[in-house]
């Protein structure tokens, strides 16, 4: 290793820069002050500035990947966005139904935000061909049910409000014969429906908001499963769902938020408006139907929440990192002025970097959003090393200009090389095939070099000002760091042995380290969207994520669907109705015609819009209460089931009368308005349902063109391709399940795509890219160190602390069962780039002075302080609730610490041991010899 020279091109350049700074300080101060302000304004987030946030993971992957091209073709063919899901959970099925009915009604009023709101199998949604989607068996059952319910339904055709309806029921009870006949049987079958109507009327009085209909299908369902079969439910009705999706930003974005008139909105912005508004509607509906566990989830919500949480985490981490680094700097040097000056220069560099990011990349993503606390911990090192050497030279009696020149020329070379090596570790990421990692390399690598500029131009200007310069001309007492360092410098063989033992132990423990691909585990476990995603994963019999296959023809779609359904990893394939378009529908058409005949005579009058006459309704219900009592006496104990139904209806009537009559006159009037809303919902639902049944089209078979818009847009593409949605029967967030599912689907269709495929390839590419980036970083760093020292031995020596520190880190991960994941794998290239700088600075000073003592000199102190600031920078990420960012902070802080310890203990001991055998370099020049001015600080 050759001695460090002041005659190299780099040294002469740094010397010239120092002269310019000393002679023309204003040239370096005011232009940068103006540039700082410009950069801050330019790099403000939109809509105030030009910086965007892109949290779409699909955009992290380059378009040249085949699997991603398949996904882009899918998005181009099927422009509908991913579903946003409202999850309603409780053990009360009726409250769940009430909630989804109410919130769906609110969502359907805001069509500019919520598209294709789906929460039940509605005849209205399916249109005039709705019955042709049902099986022949179901059509026969419907025909039988409608025939049996005719006497009860006719009561509604002859009434317009609740009073007249219950008067009709009273008449039916009063005129019912003792012996059983068709009318009596129909009346008995209507008892559950009557109970449901009365119970729902009570509920409408006790809840705020507009009451929904009791649901016509459930009224006439004799099996008792009408509610569950008519809604989207899981876990036997414990969970109800409402699905919707945001408008497409390319066609509908500008109309989403009328307050923003700044041009076309991104899809992330549109999704944000939808999610925020939906959460407001959830809160409003919870006030109407309390006592439920309600949240929203889905891929857009998970991404949106991840962005919001990451922004909060990074903001907190950045502030904490900046404060900690400044405090460490201040404490380490027992002064405030210079650390504050270095911190100011750091802030200037960060502003430059933000502007650079905005200009070159244009946005931050889920990977690059962490760059600010990273650069805080790394770029402050430039100032630490420069200030430390500057102070040392002042204490050796040099003038301010001479001290600054010595620091800039000699320590500056190490700072420059360290900046290049760390930046090289980042820039090597641009050689990968993962767009998100390439952007990380550009931002962090370029940012480090940019932060180097104010540290080497603005900081020297500020260092030449201040009273601390006078104080530092005084002599200082010997530092205890020299005595501490002698503990291992005088025992190099013992240090070698301990290091080897720790490495062996670490290697043994490192075998326990595994890779965790699960992205859902990286998010904050307390986020509601994550909590409800887990609820669905635990309760659903199939995954919510699906694979996707595009098919050119209907025949091929039906054949491929049947083939895919045979795969053992597949739970279901949607849609189920492709086969209906190809089958013989003559029998179905005949049954639909018969159903229409059954109800052809039904004619419903418009519902009464006036407030309900509470007292008249009470008298009518009291009459029904009496008739039910008579019926109970007639039945006696002969039919327990019928007795139970009569008792339930009688009790419900008694409760309704109590509730609607309680309170003063204004309260009763409010009840009258509420019941009017309820009767309007009930009669409108009946009218719309039977009118739709009467107008079912039985003239022609079902065609693709007959699909309602919500289903047509989902399953038929813009060029006529057909979509198959393939649902796995396992949790495909788990890597093993994911791999089995994707592999199985590719045996059927090599172009299969969808979220599981995207996740599988995304995770694979991300992992491989970071591993490759680590190798690229290692190669680039080795070349730069070789160029700097012109010695292969120096390259090996500078990399030894990195190798040892990384091995210790792996051992600690195995000991504490910490897995590698898709966030903390970034540690691989970063630890190499950051850790090697310690070796460079130590070897730089060793080449200058030919003595292995480092900690007692300014270089050792600077390495220690810069290491602590880097640990603080990355360690601040531990405060994050996002578990991926948290784990990155843990590993980076630990990795930097282990590399620093190895650099400050093992490397000097090794240099001392090697120096005993043979001199490594020539005697330094006279200019670099230790000064003898009075009592000195050890160098």
Label every model-predicted segment.
Residues 128-145, 585-601, 765-775:
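Short, low-order "capping/linker" segments at domain edges
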Residues 120-129, 576-591, 757-763:
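Short proline/glycine- and acidic-rich turn/helix-capping motifs at secondary-structure junctions
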Residues 1-55, 66, 72-73, 249, ...:
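Membrane-embedded transmembrane helical bundles of large multi-pass transporters/channels
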Residues 174-335, 629-777, 781:
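Extracytoplasmic
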Residues 586-653:
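Charged, amphipathic alpha-helical linkers/stalks
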Residues 80, 236-238, 421, 541-543, ...:
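Short flexible coil/turn linkers enriched for glycine and charged/polar residues
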Residues 2-319:
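Membrane-proximal extracytoplasmic
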Residues 44-91, 97, 151-154, 217-231, ...:
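Solvent-exposed, non-transmembrane loop/terminal regulatory segments of multi-pass membrane proteins
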